[in-house]
From Swiss-Prot:
This is Leucine--tRNA ligase. Gene3D superfamilies: 3.10.20.590, HUPs, Isoleucyl-tRNA Synthetase, Domain 1, Valyl/Leucyl/Isoleucyl-tRNA synthetase, editing domain. Coiled coil: none annotated. It catalyses: tRNA(Leu) + L-leucine + ATP = L-leucyl-tRNA(Leu) + AMP + diphosphate. It is found in: Cytoplasm.
Length: 804
């Protein structure tokens, strides 16, 4: 008989909701466990089967920890600002707030149908003014400390769309939507000085229990480089420029210099003969994104400015070029080129016939750059030195001669924080007619995003908010001075930088969260989400957290103690699920046909949590069959309790039960859910062979099953005679003594070849083993007509009989 999943699942979901079973209480007498999911963006498409994989993992941990006596915080919310809702509003004329609310209602319904043990009283929504009041408050604190500033930076401007596009929205110099030309244009933007935290973001990675691959990605993104600044004079002028190099030891081999096309000096130093070529090149570069420009595989392009710089080490004149692979926003916007010892410089020099001068022995530099260590040559006072010694000596020489200095740089850039969009948090700053800017007073927060019937690009590069005059234009009540509100909004990253803090105290109107509660719950014990957020979200969240630590808001330096990335669920054809491929599996359909418990069990049993695995309908059916077997073991065909279930413990199933408790507990703790579930299956197989089913073990099994299949477990627990929910029952513990085998298997060898296997008492000594081996029927047959010369018995392992 199969169980009716639809009735059972609805019954228990209603029970949990009505009784607030999973509401987190403040209880300092228990140890705490904070299990966090990366909250979803509530898209119009709804939940897909990839979402529940991570959510089920944190739910299993949360349910197990509650039963182990922990006070568990397990919340859910919505990362609801963002471009898709705005695009929908542009396309349909509908309000993104209404669209977003409908999507959230749908997501919430889908998530509840999967039986996750969230505390719904703590739900947050980044678009709720009571929430983004505090996002704005954090921005003002960053502004107060000089960490939020305005800078002019090149952006992707699309004249046809009248808006600025993010790098991801530009493909081959054209807008992703509509294929319109895109050009680079300098524009005033808000920046956050994440670079001020670069060293701490790097160093504190060492303390985190995170996958090494994620830590390495963050290290690379921060990209700390030690080297030197070297100052070059432009020949025949008073102009100079500075380059950063990690290899100052190769300065004698610098045969040309390259400036970014946007570098301030370009127009000043370009000779009249080269003006046309330089300007044409600059125009060509404007439509390229930074990613395209720095692509290592692309053909090198560039133009000579006509100017020469003076190599500070040897006084030689070297030509100054411009090339698109040098970015004005990275480093100093200028590089010294040493083609003999740098691959990119070698390619460029070969393409344009520039000199290649060897200064480190070790390769054939005419053929390719030699980037290894070696003895320095053609380098005056560095000759004979290796790389490390030469770098140190050159930096000393540069500093003594005023030609440069030691320098640490980072690949990490300050965070471009403004978006020319409507659907985001308004930035609480007012720009006055006298050129000054002031923050909106704290007591006036939240600065609410105004409702508007028409969201369309301003056409000026400003956000659509610029069109709403009555909101934008303000007057200072004290001085009568006129001003304009900042019309840029914050990026979607802003709300997700700190949401885990608001869950701790979600209804607090007076502060981001109470210091006492933050102290109680931080750091997050387990954070599970997709690896696509490995760098940006996690880096930004760590940056804000460290800043909040510095100003005394949070008590910990790091937000997330342990991080785990679940793998991706692929379509049955092993391709990524996508609407265009038509291979998306909707969880609603699975819940309808197989049940939420089956979906949860299947996704955890597919394979290791961090692996990417193809969806399989056969596997899903198998998961359902297992749950049906569990049901039939407990419930007979008439709907009553199986009469084999008897009071007490008893010896039947004793060993496999204790082994199951040990393995399931250990494997669930280690996020090895697939192997934990395998052991639950082992127990059920053994139970089907037993004549009696001791109630203590059967109840223990239901507890072990409950984090994975909570609806079925609640129903069985109820049928076993319990009135209360299983959610806070004590997690089973195993007895080490019951895991020891009374009997073990040994092999019997005849002249070194295995002839039989015997089950013998675990404590059998040599004499007993010899006796048991000789009396074994199989062994007797083999010994017929032979004389035993010697018997070697090794307790716990083998008996070897030598006979001829």
């Amino acid at each position: 008989m199969s169980f009716d999943h639809q009735t059972i699942e609805k019954k228990w979901q209603d029970y949990w909701l009505k009784n607030k079973t999973f509401a987190t209480r403040e209880d300092k007498s228990k140890p705490k466990f904070y299990a966090l999911d990366m909250f979803p963006y509530p898209s119009g498409a709804g939940l897909h089967v990839g979402h529940p994989e991570g959510y089920t993992a944190t739910d299993i941990l949360s349910r197990m920890k509650r039963m182990q006596g922990y006070n568990v915080l397990h919340p859910m919310g919505w990362d609801a600002f963002g471009l898709p809702a705005e695009q929908y509003a542009l396309d349909t004329g509908n309000d993104p707030a209404v669209f977003t609310e409908q999507n959230i209602d749908n997501f919430r319904r889908q998530i509840r149908a999967l039986g996750f043990s969230y505390d719904w009283d703590r739900e947050v929504n980044t678009t709720d003014p009571d929430y983004y009041k505090w996002t704005q408050w954090i921005f003002l604190k960053l502004y107060e400390k000089g960490l939020a500033y305005v800078d002019e930076v090149p952006v992707n401007w699309c004249p046809a769309l009248g808006t600025v596009l993010a790098n991801e929205e530009v493909i081959d110099g054209k807008s992703e939507r509509g294929g319109h030309p895109v050009e680079r244009r300098p524009m005033k933007q808000w920046m956050l000085k994440i670079t001020a935290y670069a060293d701490r973001l790097l160093e504190d990675l060492e303390e985190l229990d995170w996958p090494e691959s994620i830590k390495e990605m963050q290290r690379n993104w921060i990209g700390r480089s030690e080297g030197a600044h070297v100052h070059f004079a432009v020949d025949g002028t008073n102009e100079t420029f500075t380059v950063f190099t990690t290899r100052p030891d190769t300065l004698f081999g610098a045969t040309y210099a390259v400036l970014a096309p946007e570098h301030d000096l370009v127009q000043k130093i370009t000779t009249p003969e080269q003006k046309d070529a330089v300007n044409a090149y600059i125009e060509e570069v404007q439509s390229k994104s930074d990613l395209e420009r720095t692509d290592l595989a692309k053909t090198k392009t560039g133009v000579f400015t006509g100017a020469y710089a003076v190599n500070p080490a040897n006084g030689e004149k070297i030509p100054v070029w411009i090339a698109d692979y040098v970015l004005a926003t990275y480093g100093t916007g200028a590089v010294m080129a040493v083609p003999a010892h740098d691959e990119r410089d070698h390619e460029f020099a070969s393409a344009f016939g520039l000199p290649i001068k060897e200064v480190v022995k070790g390769g054939d530099v005419e053929k390719e750059a030699y980037t290894g260590d070696g003895e320095h040559i053609h380098s005056d006072f560095l000759n004979g030195l290796d790389k490390a010694a030469a770098i140190e000596k050159m930096i000393q020489w540069l500093e003594e001669n005023g030609k440069g200095e030691k320098k640490v740089t980072y690949r990490l850039r300050d965070w471009l924080f403004s978006r020319q969009r409507y659907w985001g948090e308004p930035i609480p700053i007012i720009h006055w007619e006298d050129g000054t800017s002031t923050p909106v007073p704290e007591e006036e927060l939240p600065l609410i995003l105004p409702k508007t019937s028409e969201i369309k690009p301003s056409g000026t590069g400003e956000s659509p908010l610029a069109n709403i005059k009555e909101w934008v234009e303000v007057t200072d009540p004290e001085t009568g001075k006129k001003g304009r509100r900042e019309t840029n909004t914050m990026p979607q990253w802003a709300g997700s930088c700190w949401y885990f803090l608001r869950y701790i105290d979600p209804k607090n109107p007076n502060e981001l969260a109470s210091p006492e509660k933050l102290k109680e719950w931080l750091p997050v014990d387990m954070y599970i989400g997709g690896a696509e957020h490995a760098v940006l979200h996690l880096l930004y969240a760590r940056f804000w957290h460290k800043f909040l630590y510095d100003i005394g808001v949070v008590p910990t330096k790091e937000p997330f103690k342990q991080l785990y990335n679940q793998g991706m669920i692929l379509g049955e054809n092993n391709e990524k699920m996508s609407k265009s491929k038509g291979n998306v599996v909707n969880p609603d359909e699975i819940v309808e046909t197989h049940g939420a418990d089956t979906l949860r069990l299947y996704e955890m049993f597919m394979g290791p949590l961090d692996a990417s695995i193809a969806w399989s309908t056969t596997g899903l059916d198998g998961a359902r069959r297992f749950l049906d077997r569990v049901w039939r073991l407990f419930i007979d065909d008439n709907g009553g309790l199986n009469e084999k279930i008897v009071e007490g413990a008893g010896e039947t199933l004793e060993r496999v039960y204790h082994e199951t408790v040990m393995k399931v507990t250990d494997h669930f703790e280690g996020l090895r859910f697939n192997t934990g579930i395998s052991q639950l299956m082992v127990f059920i197989n053994e139970a089907y062979k037993a004549d009696q089913l001791p109630k203590e073990y059967m109840e223990g099994f239901v507890k072990l099953l409950s984090p994975v299949a909570p609806h079925l477990a609640e129903e069985l627990w109820n049928r076993l005679g319990h009135e209360e929910t299983i959610a806070y029952e004590a997690w089973p513990v195993y007895d080490e003594a019951k895991l020891v085998d009374d009997e073990i298997e040994i092999v019997v060898q005849l002249n070194g070849k295995v002839k039989a296997k015997l089950n013998v008492p675990a404590d059998a000594d040599k004499e007993q083993l010899e006796e048991l081996a000789k009396n074994n029927e199989k062994v007797k047959e083999q010994l017929e007509g032979k004389t035993i010369r010697k018997v070697i018995a090794v307790p716990g392992k083998l008996v070897n009989i030598v006979a001829n």
